[in-house]
Amino acid sequence: LHLHYPFAGARMLRDLLRQEGHAIGRRQVATLMRRMGIEALYRKPHLSRRHPAHTIYPYLLRDLTIRRPNHVWAADITYIPMRRGFVYLFAILDWASRRVLAWRLSNTLTTDFCLEAVREAITQYGCPEIFNTDQGCQFTSQEFTGLLKDQGIQISMDGKGCWRDNVFVERLWKSIKYEEVYLHAYETVGAAQQGLARYLMFYNQTRPHQALDGQTPDQVYSDHLTTRRTAA
């Protein structure tokens, strides 16, 4: 049942088991879940905990028309569950093309692995005009905001608790988890790294997007770069 309904907690699993004729209580289900090392898979709290001393920047994307790659990049952190435990995934998404530009996995929720990915994306693709994140302490830190400012990038941050302000990253998380992560019980961080690398290559190069008129993120991103070179 957990593999079919990975979002189900002890109460829901109890009710599902009862539908199948099993007389079992919530506490018994919770005990069995602990013994088996499984838990409901959902976005956990405190990934985006604010730091009271850090500056919060305004949200710049409201009513903004975003049609060209490298206009706006968006980034966030999510949990990637494994058979036992979890790791953190940080990814940078080009808003217009939906292309994943860089990503990193980490065992700890620090700023360092986010900075590595940002530097990689800037080195490979240049700088966006605007970089959007939530108000998590990793993104409001002087190290993170300083890196963006040094590159002349405008900083945009979601409203507090407004996940819809970064909706395309949330859709990316859903695709990653339901099309890759929930189908595999990663035994190690290395296995998670390999699985995500394989999926994100598929996501960028092969997976058609309805919002992109059936094109892939790579096609939209590359077409823009080709058009710019031709115009120049």
Language-model-derived ranges and their functions:
Residues L1-A232:
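Charged DNA-binding/catalytic regions of mobile-element recombinases
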